[in-house]
């Protein structure tokens, strides 16, 4: 399959990766994958590769398409970026690119406080220490995964245990290594036939020919060539700054860099990946992503300062939760990101906007537009499908304004437009609980979210029929994602409530309950103190809801794929 920059996912175009990719040695792809192939072969056949098989694998990897090599290197750099502490990532790029004097770059330790080991993109079950990976990637030294004991840290290194700065890592050379280096040098010089080395006395003795056997498949010239060649050389895809498709919020809009990528990214052919964009990195007007301290771009805020604007790491994933999930305003407000007040090339007409990086809601199965359910956004904010709430508004207060209160003691709480409305089928995997309608007087259907299709079991131990009860308790052992327990700890929790009579097929204590024309039926209360709903079973007798005084254990489950018909209750 032909890979190109257009095929790569967004996380492979982070400026951290774009700045470091030209400094990755070409030997890294061949070396890591060759060791993985040898490991897989040994596990499968319980014997080592022959020299001919290993040489064939080496030639295959060396002749691999450049786009595949770059894609592999981009993914590995993205993985290494997460293993480096956030406050050291900028220093790492500046030192590797030669724009700053080498300093310590600390990595995140493992559970034992030692340096991490990674599998280099799940290549067999072989793991490599981070400092080994750095030496192979940026210095092109072909080390084995067991050569960690040969690595030594520079005397200037302040934390040798966790530092992954390539300039602080050296390889200890033993006497045997020096002897072999001299032997190989003399052997190559003797084969060159130059007059200066034609003296037989200077040639290596003949007995040395039988003393060493080369176990690898690389010769000296191949090793030198691939260790000195960047992985981006001769590929035709050298990631020029003017042609790199990048996210608009990675760049300073004052720099005048021509960006050609919009917010939307083409879908990947593989499994969905998490796109981590928790750090902003700015290019300079000259095209460098990391300006030197003397450049004009460095006079603004640093990368670490810009990270503070992003209150929390922002991840964009495939929607796996309901649009209005059980979240609090403290959980949702840090996700809002303030963008620079400049024109965004990927978004026409964006200016002075505050938008959230949450994913848009999934397609709604309802027969009416979902947009009509959401409260209208203020006109001073950019209208975008990912917009949630402005940072100065409380999501709970916003939704609470549209939920009419219900007084159990009031005999009538009728609402106009009380005709029943059929809600679409509930999917088996998930359906979000819908938000209240902007119009308080309108009838709003309630869609229940259930994870399986087992019969309904409603256990209401200790229920006492009391129509005037206003406080409910539920046991703490309630099953997650099945129902929500009410708690009297928060008085505002029971402030807003609305009763609905829902017709469904139930199974209680082994007998089926069907919707009947009698006056006694079952229903639920739907309380919305913010962005989530709690379901409480109740009974309606003579058009009067009878709420349980003490609900200890209860659960609701829909059978199959029912239709829920919402009606208003008096």
From Swiss-Prot:
Compositionally biased tracts (Low complexity): 408-421, 464-474
Expression (tissue specificity): Highest expression in lung, skeletal muscle and heart. Lower levels in liver, kidney and brain. Very low levels in testis and spleen.
Outcome (variant: residue 131 to G): In strain: NIH Swiss
InterPro entries in alphabetical order: CTF/NFI, CTF/NFI_DNA-bd-dom, CTF/NFI_DNA-bd_CS, CTF/NFI_DNA-bd_N, MAD_homology1_Dwarfin-type
Compositional bias segments (type: Polar residues): 324-340
In-chain residues carrying the UniProt-annotated modification Phosphothreonine: 286
Positions of post-translational Phosphoserine modification: 264, 292, 295, 312, 328, 333
Biased amino acid composition, Pro residues: 359-368
Described purpose of this protein according to its UniProt entry: Transcriptional activator of GFAP, essential for proper brain development. Recognizes and binds the palindromic sequence 5'-TTGGCNNNNNGCCAA-3' present in viral and cellular promoters and in the origin of replication of adenovirus type 2. These proteins are individually capable of activating transcription and replication.
Family under the similarity heading: Belongs to the CTF/NF-I family.
Comment field on protein domains: The 9aaTAD motif is a transactivation domain present in a large number of yeast and animal transcription factors.
Name the record gives this protein: Nuclear factor 1 B-type
Species the sequence originates in: Mus musculus (Mouse)
């Amino acid at each position: 399959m032909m890979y190109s920059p257009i095929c790569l996912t967004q996380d492979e175009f982070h400026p951290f990766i774009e700045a470091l990719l030209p400094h990755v040695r070409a030997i890294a792809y061949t070396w890591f994958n060759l060791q993985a192939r040898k490991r897989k072969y040994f596990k499968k056949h319980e014997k080592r590769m022959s020299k001919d098989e290993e040489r064939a694998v080496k030639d295959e990897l060396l002749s691999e398409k450049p786009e595949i090599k770059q894609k592999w290197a981009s993914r590995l750099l993205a993985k290494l970026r997460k293993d480096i502490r956030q406050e050291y990532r900028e220093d790492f790029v500046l030192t590797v690119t030669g724009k700053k004097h080498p300093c310590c770059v600390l990595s995140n330790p493992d559970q034992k406080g030692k340096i991490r080991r990674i599998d280099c993109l799940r290549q067999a079950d072989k793991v490599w220490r981070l400092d080994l990976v750095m030496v192979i990637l940026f210095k092109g030294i072909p080390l084995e995964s067991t050569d960690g004991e040969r690595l030594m840290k520079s005397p200037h290194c302040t934390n040798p245990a966790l530092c992954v700065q390539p300039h602080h890592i050296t390889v200890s050379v033993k006497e045997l290594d020096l002897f072999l280096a001299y032997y190989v040098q003399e052997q190559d010089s003797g084969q060159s036939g130059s007059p200066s080395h034609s003296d037989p006395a200077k040639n290596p003795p003949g007995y040395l020919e039988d003393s060493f056997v080369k176990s690898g498949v690389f010769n000296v010239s191949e090793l030198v060539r691939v260790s000195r060649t960047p992985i981006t050389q001769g590929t035709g895809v050298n990631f020029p700054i003017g042609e790199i498709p990048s996210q608009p919020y990675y760049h300073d809009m004052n720099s005048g860099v021509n960006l050609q990528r919009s917010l939307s990214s083409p879908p990947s052919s593989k499994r969905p990946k998490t796109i981590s964009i928790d750090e902003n990195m700015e290019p300079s007007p000259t095209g460098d992503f990391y300006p030197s301290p003397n450049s004009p771009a460095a006079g603004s805020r640093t990368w670490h300062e810009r990270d503070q604007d992003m209150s929390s790491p922002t991840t964009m994933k495939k929607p796996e939760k309901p649009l209005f999930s059980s979240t609090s305003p403290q959980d949702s407000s840090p996700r809002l990101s303030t963008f620079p007040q400049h024109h965004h090339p990927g978004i026409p007409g964006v200016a002075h906007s505050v938008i959230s990086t949450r994913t848009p809601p999934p397609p709604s199965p309802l027969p009416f537009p979902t947009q009509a359910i959401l409260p209208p956004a203020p006109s001073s904010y950019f209208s975008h499908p990912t917009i949630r709430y402005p940072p100065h508004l409380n999501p709970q207060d916003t939704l609470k304004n549209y939920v009419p209160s219900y007084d159990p003691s009031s005999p009538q709480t009728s609402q106009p437009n009380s005709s029943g409305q059929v809600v679409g089928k509930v999917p088996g995997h998930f359906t979000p609980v819908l938000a209240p309608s902007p119009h308080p007087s309108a009838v709003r259907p309630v869609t229940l979210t259930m994870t399986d299709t087992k019969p309904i079991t409603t256990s209401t131990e200790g229920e006492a029929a009391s129509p005037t009860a206003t406080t409910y308790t539920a046991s703490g052992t309630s099953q997650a994602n099945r129902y929500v327990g009410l708690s009297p700890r928060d008085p505002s929790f029971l402030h807003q409530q609305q009763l609905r009579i829902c017709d469904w097929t139930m199974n209680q204590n082994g007998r089926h309950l069907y919707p009947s024309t009698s006056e006694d039926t079952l229903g639920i209360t739907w309380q919305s103190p913010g962005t989530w709903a709690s379901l409480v079973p109740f009974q309606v007798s003579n058009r009067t809801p009878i709420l349980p005084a003490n609900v200890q254990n209860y659960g609701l489950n829909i059978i199959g794929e029912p239709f829920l018909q919402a009606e208003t209750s008096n």
